[in-house]
A protein has these predicted regions:
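N-terminal Lys/Arg-rich, disordered targeting/topogenic segments
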Residues: 1-6
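Glycine-rich, often proline-containing surface loops adjacent to acidic residues and nearby aromatics
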Residues: 93-96, 118
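Short pre-active-site segment immediately N-terminal to the catalytic Zn-binding motif
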Residues: 96-112
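Active-site recognition of the HExxH zinc-binding catalytic motif
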Residues: 111-123
Length: 160
């Protein structure tokens, strides 16, 4: 009888672990399932043609296209020297895009949305995947000319 009870406890433990693993593995799908993109944000996301996984990640962050005051409230921790048009808040797993309506900057909302989604995707990587990606990115970055636009703009950001 004792052996049956031990096996039953093990089975219950195994089922609980399986459920937790499933919930963790599909957390983005659960968060994204009921989120509906509306208005301009829907058009922006449609125009950038994300993969299925990228679309799920984006929707899981419940992205918001915000006007100036709301955006500044959501993204209050940026430097005054850097123009911030989007913000992925890792602590909240939320994505915010400043609603730039300027004919002088065509596509800026699309580029910003895709860029911030990449921050969210990076946040979801396992530590060993981040280490590999960081290494690859550093190798490419180190090959850039010293006066490249990317190097110049990266100097505005804090080292991580």
């Amino acid at each position: 009888m004792k052996q049956k009870r031990g096996f039953g406890s093990f089975l219950i433990w195994l089922v609980i672990v399986a459920i937790l693993f499933f919930a963790y593995s599909y957390r983005d799908e659960f968060k994204a399932r009921d989120f509906i993109l509306t208005g301009d944000l829907s058009e922006i996301v449609s125009s950038i043609k994300l993969t299925g996984r990228a679309d799920t990640i984006l929707r899981a962050t419940h992205p918001e296209l915000q006007q100036k005051d709301a955006f500044n409230e959501s993204c209050h921790s940026h430097s005054q020297e850097v123009y911030v048009l989007g913000w992925y808040r890792e602590d909240q797993d939320r994505l915010y895009v400043y609603n730039v309506n300027s004919k002088d900057l065509p596509g800026v909302r699309e580029v910003t949305t895709a860029h911030e989604m990449l921050h969210a995707a990076y946040h979801r990587l396992y530590f060993w995947e981040k280490a590999d990606l960081d290494k690859e990115l550093k190798q490419v970055y180190d090959q850039l000319p010293q006066d490249s636009e990317l190097r110049t703009s990266m100097q505005s950001y804090p080292a991580s």
